[in-house]
């Protein structure tokens, strides 16, 4: 994904490295210098994600917030790159004892873990585990009775969109059976393995119906160098008046920009 998708996993990788583990971070080639700057071993899928992210069609869909069309576009891109992702991921995982995957790499991560007969830890920055206590991040607020269904639908939308690419990777590179029709969510590679969430329980409290293997760990932030000095123009701006408040959302679009603005003002 974009830097916002990758940097939390750099922080997580640094934490695991500090605990004595050997880490390989696998992503798109344009993140090599960023990952290496934090002292982590980098393995590339071989392509530059900017080619897809900066595509005019992709940008237009992102701005509109139409998830279904955006998912279809991403699925088509994944199908085109399926062999490259599988080959790069399989090479990187050689000799490793575990695969850790975020949402974007979940399906290929599970397939590689199955191929190598090693476990996979799911590590997300948004809620993905079904619960009755909140709706999916891709749906509006719903009656509690529909919340769990919204998560299941989201999981199926993601899987069915990427199923073709996953099947190609499993057949042509990994030489393993295709995943079940409804997805690899019951794969032995993730059975009884932890699920990690990189956000604060003060922001999203842990639902009471999540199991004991699901952990909200707090945000995954990298330790920046403490010798950084802001540019003079920025210092002048900050000292010219009351302390400003900055609220940003990176590359995310909003389906209700006016409501979002009202919420920020409140």
What are these language model-derived features?
Residues 1, 248-251:
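Short glycine-centered, acidic/aromatic-flanked micro-motifs in structured strand/loop junctions
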Residues 1-43, 94:
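N-terminal subdomain of nucleotide-sugar transferases
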Residues 28-244, 251, 256-262:
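Nucleotide-sugar-dependent glycosyltransferase catalytic domains
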């Amino acid at each position: 994904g974009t830097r916002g998708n990758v940097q939390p996993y750099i922080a997580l990788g640094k934490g695991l490295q500090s605990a004595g583990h050997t880490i390989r971070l696998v992503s798109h080639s344009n993140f090599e210098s960023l990952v290496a700057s934090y002292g982590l071993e980098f393995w590339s899928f071989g392509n530059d994600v900017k080619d897809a992210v900066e595509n005019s069609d992709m940008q237009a869909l992102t701005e509109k917030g139409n998830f279904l069309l955006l998912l279809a576009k991403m699925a088509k891109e994944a199908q085109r790159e399926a062999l490259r992702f599988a080959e790069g991921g399989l090479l990187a995982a050689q000799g490793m004892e575990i695969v850790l995957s975020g949402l974007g790499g979940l399906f290929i991560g599970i397939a590689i873990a199955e191929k190598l007969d090693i476990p996979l830890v799911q590590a997300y920055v948004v809620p993905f585990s079904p619960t009755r206590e909140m709706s999916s991040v891709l749906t509006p607020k719903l009656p509690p009775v529909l919340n769990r269904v919204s998560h299941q639908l989201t999981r199926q939308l993601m899987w069915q969109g990427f199923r073709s690419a996953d099947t190609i990777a499993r057949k042509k590179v990994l030489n393993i059976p295709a995943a079940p029709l409804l997805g690899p969510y019951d794969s032995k590679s993730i059975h009884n393995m932890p699920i990690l969430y990189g956000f604060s329980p003060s922001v999203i409290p842990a639902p009471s119906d999540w199991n004991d293997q699901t952990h909200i760990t707090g945000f995954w932030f990298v330790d920046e160098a403490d010798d950084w000095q802001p540019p003079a123009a920025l210092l002048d701006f900050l000292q010219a008046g009351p302390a400003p408040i900055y609220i940003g959302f990176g590359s995310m679009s909003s389906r209700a920009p006016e409501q979002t603005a009202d919420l920020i003002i409140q």
